[in-house]
């Protein structure tokens, strides 16, 4: 503990448990003050000494110089504590000028602007008066009746000056009591009886039925209760005395030219003192009331400007050309405010920065530090060593020696930096790997050398990037740097658990070349070797080269120790690579007896880590890097223009596509397809053409030349070293389609590639996309950084607090299937999670794992063999720990590959993992040069394996051609394997043709279904005759003539705009041969409602067959998807905003019925529940929106009734927390997956947990809660336990979802919320509620200057609590709180403390320990 007190501050920071904030009473302000300030003088302009009685008065605030009074009579430490009888200054340290407050006694009270102006006005709410009325009383001279006595006025009524004068004439001076100005408000507030108001409001709340009035009453009631609970008095919101900040916090600094630079606060204080003194003199002269009122108003404005000059643009705060003066509020809020600038982001000493260069000869734990920098950074250490060795007798001489760079100094420097790690940081630090520790190696020059393998963690490159160096000073800091932050400890990425120390660029190319197999046409026979030394000799002599095919005798050791050998076909390069592999049974030669690309290399590093541990991995990575660099330079791979081979088939493909597009134009001109359908088809056709050319180009470029050598560019892209297939496509294939800045795709593609060169027109077309990319980057970087900040803020107090919370809850993990393809297997979803229940093999009944067991790589085989399709695992969402989560609910710490440690700050890690790729991706939007990245629309379903078909919800009809047409909106095709396990599940849209029947066997690549992706059809279920109902030409349908084709279509238009269209419900009705309306299988009439924009395919009176398309609704033209579309989506999800056009979700299982329209704009849909006891649910859908259900359809709870994204709040309300979590995870992961970024689900779950912390009270039970109040879930559950024990009625509540910004501001800690956003509002609310900050989170503790309660600080906090206890309680506390973390080591120390001395007393204390 003594070392912690290194800088003397910590003792203050450690000596309290919580911080409370409240409104300061006049008495408390006077008690804090050391004296009243009446004079505006600051310093004497001749002597530059501070003036007595002024704003810098030493008598009030303390001496300017250490231990010296103003007149100079007392000048030494020995006089400390004496007050000079001549000048009245206490002799003490000048530091007190940072702590001692003064005050100004105001002649007239003023209202505090925060309580008056910050909306909603607190003073207004308490008095139940509108803000305008209060302002009129304060500034415009209106009167308020305090006591009506015998007059007809009401108490608290506001009357104008004219009415006041008339009333005074009528009723006399004592007829009634009314006041104006601040005194009136103060009097009203003083007379408030809060207890009586509370009782009245509670009665009102019970009797009122109006929702509006209820909300208003609840707000006022909450305010009144806060005042009662906190012990604040309402009249304290009116100031009669103002505190003055210590002078060293508002200093007077003289500039070079001798002019003083004054802090803005001094200006505000001077204005207040001036106006206050002037008012005091005026009052003695008994002037007219208007003069007094004006002077009081000016005083009020001056005080307002001091507290918050941004609220009203007062003249006083904008003095002439002096510009804006900063107020106290401005000093707190914003990026430059006290919280974010000085408390959360401090500047650090012992640091330097320089440009980085590559250090290929370094080991992973090393970095090259320039000698000049090291000399400066380690100066104090060198000084002490020089003095200790007697080389320099004094510190002054030691400094001189360092400056003149004497030879002795370098020897001492070498000794000092040995085993002393330094920290390297690269801005922006997006995740914790942006700050790592290294052992410094002294180098010449001025640039820092960085190990190539850590570049991806820092996201660094060597094009001029700079990095900062920091020196950890204390022993503890050095220990933490070495044990926790060393680059060798950061092998795995915390966001997905994959290695982040993986080779890239040149290294990959070198290893790829090393494992390549090139067939030399001239070599006929394959050489055979027995030993590696023979291979080396053959290589040296040029008999074989690195990539030749050879045979080699490979020795293999069996588990029992016997050695066997076998002949393998390989290359010398692969054998060279095999020499650096660690020896382990899981690492076989087969791993590298193949061409290694970046993907394989990553999985090898991962496997080495899992099999051999950290040390071996680090050594292996370094060796791998050296090999990669060596062979990349030996390979001679270069980038040549001739290497870009344009495929011969290009012209044919382009011609085919152009031909098809001409066909589409003809179809469009003949009126067979609509404009948007033609556009979509053209875009799709060009996408296909581009892909075909790219495929042929890859085929041509991947072949060896006549000498058996591979193409250099192909090697670079194929190995994953640089470039990608899409970039190669643009170099040698066809650039393809471009996107406009709006995101629309330009339908004329760029047919040329970069090798051929673009025409002027093509070049101009491509500038669109390129510029959009650059503009996007600039805008989105800021967006993504802000998202990360909000995520960190919402999750910062989420740490691992215990091993097991004891819950039996969890979530069901399943494989993720998108578009019929498994994008995340069950293995990858459950890896690193803890099983929530005992899990058995469904066939054999064998127990696979028990509840509470961590599922690691060794257990995954069991899951595969058992063919499980779902596993119930523990989740942060269902964890029941208080103030954090438990280790078992979180599972594996991805950065170390083992169960998470107690004290880990999982919230911050989750926020960084989700936020970091956002920034990365947004910085990279333009990498594909704006070419449109859009997949061809999926229009069919193909079996990807041999399987049996199972149909779910398949309502089909047979059309006139004998095709099976799907009529259900929720039809799914499930493919089962031979054992009957589900392998794939696809939803098939309404109107699709189905080629397979229930139970049919299909073979791989067989087509199961197909549909038109560009339109949504409406299909008849039975045969009959069509009749138009409410489809009136000119009102609800129009013939729309297509200008370019001259063909007209009947299109449904917005009938609400027409006078006659008020009550229309346009629909097509199906009649039988007798003219009666056909009844469908659901017992409903066959009437088909048509939305706005639908194109009618049938005439009135036309005969139709079952399965015919009678109407089609064109889908809008498709926009390109890239992360810039994705990032706002992620933000929308985390902020829990309603999507712009959100879909309506069904609340119950039931049947759909269409009701009568609601006015002109809405359409009624009823759902009649299956459960007859439930009421019918009614929904209002905007007219013209396409409902995806028909009358008579059966819908499940949670199904969508119309197109669009569902609202998350609806999902939570209807389906519950797990369904919401599944929806959010799948939506967020979809965005990241599109960019190839992998994030573990648990990070999203941690953020979600923070968003779900509050509940809404639906029934307060026997408590003081109000209906609709939002309370912390933990608080309610704790209260309910107490109520249950006492046999009282418990509180009922429903979970609510808060966006990350709202959740951050709603946190228990007002310090954390104030430092996030809306500082003044947060502090105002906290003050009148008398809030306490328990200091549980990381942010609050950083702000008050303590160790954070995570990691080492978590344990230190526990030990401090232990130190506070009686020694007899040590063991009990230790066993409950610390044994799980410190084990038996701690208990032996505690026994030592509790061993009685010979006289029976217990000596020693944990504090000493």
From Swiss-Prot:
It is an enzyme of class 2 (transferase). Transmembrane segments: none annotated. InterPro entries: DNA-dir_RpoC_beta_prime, DNA-dir_RpoC_beta_prime_bact, RNA_pol_asu, RNA_pol_N, RNA_pol_Rpb1_1, RNA_pol_Rpb1_3, RNA_pol_Rpb1_3_sf, RNA_pol_Rpb1_4. Its cofactor is Mg(2+); Zn(2+). CDD domains: RNAP_beta'_C (cd02655), RNAP_beta'_N (cd01609). SMART domains: RPOLA_N. It catalyses: RNA(n) + a ribonucleoside 5'-triphosphate = RNA(n+1) + diphosphate. One of its GO terms (molecular function) is zinc ion binding. Keywords: DNA-directed RNA polymerase, Magnesium, Metal-binding, Nucleotidyltransferase, Transcription, Transferase, Zinc. It comes from the Bacteria. Its EC number is 2.7.7.6. Mg(2+) binds at residues 461, 463, 465. One of its GO terms (biological process) is DNA-templated transcription. Zn(2+) 1 binds at residues 69, 71, 84, 87. The RNAP catalytic core consists of 2 alpha, 1 beta, 1 beta' and 1 omega subunit. When a sigma factor is associated with the core the holoenzyme is formed, which can initiate transcription. NCBIfam families: rpoC_TIGR. Belongs to the RNA polymerase beta' chain family. PANTHER family: DNA-DIRECTED RNA POLYMERASE, DNA-DIRECTED RNA POLYMERASE SUBUNIT BETA. HAMAP family: RNApol_bact_RpoC. This is DNA-directed RNA polymerase subunit beta'. It comes from Anaplasma phagocytophilum (strain HZ).
